[in-house]
Amino acid sequence: MKMTRRAFVKANAAASAAAVAGITLPASATNLIASSDQTAIHWDKAPCRFCGTGCSVLVGTQDGRVVATQGDPEAPVNKGLNCIKGYFLSKIMYGQDRLKTPLLRMKDGQYHKDGEFTPVSWDTAFDVMAEKWKASLKTKGPTSVGMFGSGQWTVMEGYAAVKLMKAGFRSNNIDPNARHCMASAVVGFMRTFGIDEPMGCYDDFEHADAFVLWGSNMAEMHPVLWTRITDRRLSHPHVKVNVLSTYYHRSFELADHGYIFHPQSDLAIANFIANYIIQNDAVNWDFVNKHTHFKQAVTDIGYGLRDDHPLQKKAKNANSGDVSDISFEEYKKSVAPYTVEKASEISGVSPDKLITLAKQYADPNTKVMSLWTMGMNQHTRGVWMQSLVYNLHLLTGKIATPGNSPFSLTGQPSACGTAREVGTFAHRLPADMVVANPKHRAIAEKVWKLPEGTIPEKPGFHAVQQDRMLKDGVLNCYWVQCNNNMQAGPNINEERLPGYRNPENFIVVSDAYPTVTAQAADLVLPTAMWVEKEGAYGNAERRTQVWYQQVKTVGESHSDSWQVIEFSKRFKVEDVWPEELLAKAPQYRGKTLYDVLFKNGQVDKFPLSEARELNDDAHHFGFYIQKGLFEEYAEFGRGHGHDLAPYDVYHQVRGLRWPVVDGKETKWRFKEGSDPYAKAGSGWDFYGKPDGKAWIISSPYEAPPEMPNEEYDLWLCTGRVLEHWHTGTMTRRVPELYKAVPDALCFMHHEDAQARGLRRGDEVLISNSRGEVRVRVETRGRNKPPKGLVFVPFFDARILVNKLILDATDPLSKQTDFKKCPVKITKVA
């Protein structure tokens, strides 16, 4: 072994120390001390695998394994910091129960719905899958097959899945788990601005004078961003932090003003603030007159339940997202009932506190950053709440300038970059296009080299609807990738599990671990994780980041995109397209979906020589497939306000915020001088709308679908904790994180506990008409609910708390409300 001078000195020092201790140090031990090619750790960059913050980490690999990670000091997002989960990223891929081979339910050597999971080859797995898909497509058509994806998919994985489903199988029945976390944010952006994703960026943290958290525990869910708020608050005494929530949590520890409100009453609070702005002559008339229109939303729209549900039948305008033009005077009249007294009565927040909050929005000299996560999004009126907060910023002109920013925080690493931008929702296409728009379908068909009429015009089944259709036998072949919906989704017992175990259905789950969802499937496919593949994520501030594959995958695992693309080889075009479509493209006869979708002269145009040596997918397919998928996808957004840089550029930087025009990223959208798409002389240009004007939309307070009653007398709120991410598939396999928080607890007010004869640590039964769970009571600790409400996190697979949640959704976004349902609690004898 060749040794450097530094290594020689270190080795001699070690030998001297050993001699003093009376120890003889063998020559073979020197490589424990000396640096060499064999012992060196190789470092490369990658975005974190967890939340939507988009921290960059340095990944240390040695002997084909990830052995260490650290915060990337060159990253503008996290500036070298990680949260506790990020510091243990090196361990997420090496759980003892990592799946390494396909598993098929079999009995007597054949597939059987009630059989035992048995290892099979990939060929066998795909043979069975293809047989089921072809039979379903032949007998029941494209609407009988579906896919449930993820905001954790890489950009390329989501894009490949969209192409296979919407162009190949001609089914729009593809939806991401981002439906459960970001759908209301999407619809809110589209209604108000005509284009998706935040206009601000993380630079706003260093400019704002007031932060308002509307249902977001950033201290635990976005801790790295919370450090930036903390630094701003502690470094600038005039800065104020406001936290609104239905229970006390760690973000309140920094708050200057905390507001505990009754569930659903945030609607009343936001309307009061708008009324306060008007009554106190704080409207920025120059901005409002030049850049906004006033609209009235249709009300009494139901709760996204099944059509035969009594609440849905009762709604006068079920599922309607219609709006009508109104004048400012009509808007003023619509918010006038929301006096401080009325808002206090509805919300439980004192009048003086409400006025304190309203003054910060009304003060023209106070830059306000509004932030929200699941507290606002997982809400049966989540879209309305988005609009109501945008109203406050539009009325005052506090938008799209440094420190003035309504900002939706994402929970998954690529809920923006993949679910939203790629368009993996049942109604969307890339770059904010939708399947219902014939012009948009024509654009997609042109980019994809498909005959006119390939993409269906009717939106597919959204996430909650997919569960219902599986249960009803309408949806029969279903592929779940990169999510654990059997644990994460609502109403498990009544709507989801029956569909998975319906004997008419064939369920495939692609995952790295045997999750609750995988255990309910018929076929489980082992999946590559994080830096076992090359990929790209898009974070909450529109920052696209890419990474190289850095280690080989475990066992026979493959990336989600490899699985999708390889599966496409099993289908001839004649198997899936009708004759009238084939007649428009006779050149495709006899070709596979792989030939048409992925070997199309675009995806395969970048040679293998451009890829790194360690790139399993590229070597398998024979070309630089990640670059090909990315560049074809990027064609949708370039020149249309979603411009991405060339793929190779992203490997050289710590991400870029789109639109990227002439090599320059965009920090603040819609603002002249910052956004290249804002017209000269406009000041602000909300170009997502045809006339460049944003909408101020009036929406009232409406009660939730269920309220506590004599039998079910407590509110239940579900959510997350710092140490675990979502359902804990990764974090619960990290020993340090598991030991820190091994179990989900029921956080409860001590007086509610005493009234039921309960003490801290007692095991209780939480129940309602949909199910029951056993959990231990916690009357202290980080989360402190008010009387009448309990909080239980959903990371614990042994406590499937979401079985208690009603599958009510926002009728406009189809996003489930996980934050409020009635339950009762009894002590386990």
UniProtKB/Swiss-Prot annotation:
<dbReference type="GO" id="GO:0050140">
    <property type="term" value="F:nitrate reductase (cytochrome) activity"/>
</dbReference>
<dbReference type="GO" id="GO:0030151">
    <property type="term" value="F:molybdenum ion binding"/>
</dbReference>
<dbReference type="InterPro" id="IPR006311">
    <property type="entry name" value="TAT_signal"/>
</dbReference>
<feature type="binding site">
    <location>
        <position position="533"/>
    </location>
    <ligand>
        <name>Mo-bis(molybdopterin guanine dinucleotide)</name>
    </ligand>
</feature>
<feature type="binding site">
    <location>
        <position position="83"/>
    </location>
    <ligand>
        <name>[4Fe-4S] cluster</name>
    </ligand>
</feature>
<keyword id="KW-0004">4Fe-4S</keyword>
<dbReference type="InterPro" id="IPR050123">
    <property type="entry name" value="Prok_molybdopt-oxidoreductase"/>
</dbReference>
<dbReference type="GO" id="GO:0043546">
    <property type="term" value="F:molybdopterin cofactor binding"/>
</dbReference>
<feature type="binding site">
    <location>
        <position position="378"/>
    </location>
    <ligand>
        <name>Mo-bis(molybdopterin guanine dinucleotide)</name>
    </ligand>
</feature>
<feature type="signal peptide" description="Tat-type signal">
    <location>
        <begin position="1"/>
        <end position="29"/>
    </location>
</feature>
<dbReference type="InterPro" id="IPR006656">
    <property type="entry name" value="Mopterin_OxRdtase"/>
</dbReference>
<feature type="binding site">
    <location>
        <position position="374"/>
    </location>
    <ligand>
        <name>Mo-bis(molybdopterin guanine dinucleotide)</name>
    </ligand>
</feature>
<feature type="binding site">
    <location>
        <position position="802"/>
    </location>
    <ligand>
        <name>Mo-bis(molybdopterin guanine dinucleotide)</name>
    </ligand>
</feature>
<feature type="binding site">
    <location>
        <begin position="245"/>
        <end position="249"/>
    </location>
    <ligand>
        <name>Mo-bis(molybdopterin guanine dinucleotide)</name>
    </ligand>
</feature>
<feature type="binding site">
    <location>
        <begin position="510"/>
        <end position="511"/>
    </location>
    <ligand>
        <name>Mo-bis(molybdopterin guanine dinucleotide)</name>
    </ligand>
</feature>
<dbReference type="InterPro" id="IPR010051">
    <property type="entry name" value="Periplasm_NO3_reductase_lsu"/>
</dbReference>
<keyword id="KW-0574">Periplasm</keyword>
<dbReference type="GO" id="GO:0051539">
    <property type="term" value="F:4 iron, 4 sulfur cluster binding"/>
</dbReference>
<comment type="subunit">
    <text>Component of the periplasmic nitrate reductase NapAB complex composed of NapA and NapB.</text>
</comment>
<feature type="binding site">
    <location>
        <begin position="264"/>
        <end position="266"/>
    </location>
    <ligand>
        <name>Mo-bis(molybdopterin guanine dinucleotide)</name>
    </ligand>
</feature>
<dbReference type="GO" id="GO:0042597">
    <property type="term" value="C:periplasmic space"/>
</dbReference>
<feature type="binding site">
    <location>
        <position position="152"/>
    </location>
    <ligand>
        <name>Mo-bis(molybdopterin guanine dinucleotide)</name>
    </ligand>
</feature>
<dbReference type="GO" id="GO:0042128">
    <property type="term" value="P:nitrate assimilation"/>
</dbReference>
<keyword id="KW-0479">Metal-binding</keyword>
<dbReference type="GO" id="GO:0045333">
    <property type="term" value="P:cellular respiration"/>
</dbReference>
<keyword id="KW-0534">Nitrate assimilation</keyword>
<protein>
    <recommendedName>
        <fullName>Periplasmic nitrate reductase</fullName>
        <ecNumber>1.9.6.1</ecNumber>
    </recommendedName>
</protein>
<feature type="binding site">
    <location>
        <position position="181"/>
    </location>
    <ligand>
        <name>Mo-bis(molybdopterin guanine dinucleotide)</name>
    </ligand>
</feature>
<dbReference type="InterPro" id="IPR006657">
    <property type="entry name" value="MoPterin_dinucl-bd_dom"/>
</dbReference>
<dbReference type="Pfam" id="PF04879">
    <property type="entry name" value="Molybdop_Fe4S4"/>
</dbReference>
<feature type="binding site">
    <location>
        <position position="560"/>
    </location>
    <ligand>
        <name>Mo-bis(molybdopterin guanine dinucleotide)</name>
    </ligand>
</feature>
<dbReference type="GO" id="GO:0016020">
    <property type="term" value="C:membrane"/>
</dbReference>
<dbReference type="InterPro" id="IPR027467">
    <property type="entry name" value="MopterinOxRdtase_cofactor_BS"/>
</dbReference>
<feature type="binding site">
    <location>
        <position position="177"/>
    </location>
    <ligand>
        <name>Mo-bis(molybdopterin guanine dinucleotide)</name>
    </ligand>
</feature>
<dbReference type="GO" id="GO:0006777">
    <property type="term" value="P:Mo-molybdopterin cofactor biosynthetic process"/>
</dbReference>
<feature type="binding site">
    <location>
        <position position="484"/>
    </location>
    <ligand>
        <name>Mo-bis(molybdopterin guanine dinucleotide)</name>
    </ligand>
</feature>
<feature type="binding site">
    <location>
        <position position="48"/>
    </location>
    <ligand>
        <name>[4Fe-4S] cluster</name>
    </ligand>
</feature>
<keyword id="KW-0411">Iron-sulfur</keyword>
<keyword id="KW-0560">Oxidoreductase</keyword>
<feature type="binding site">
    <location>
        <begin position="718"/>
        <end position="727"/>
    </location>
    <ligand>
        <name>Mo-bis(molybdopterin guanine dinucleotide)</name>
    </ligand>
</feature>
<feature type="binding site">
    <location>
        <begin position="214"/>
        <end position="221"/>
    </location>
    <ligand>
        <name>Mo-bis(molybdopterin guanine dinucleotide)</name>
    </ligand>
</feature>
<keyword id="KW-0813">Transport</keyword>
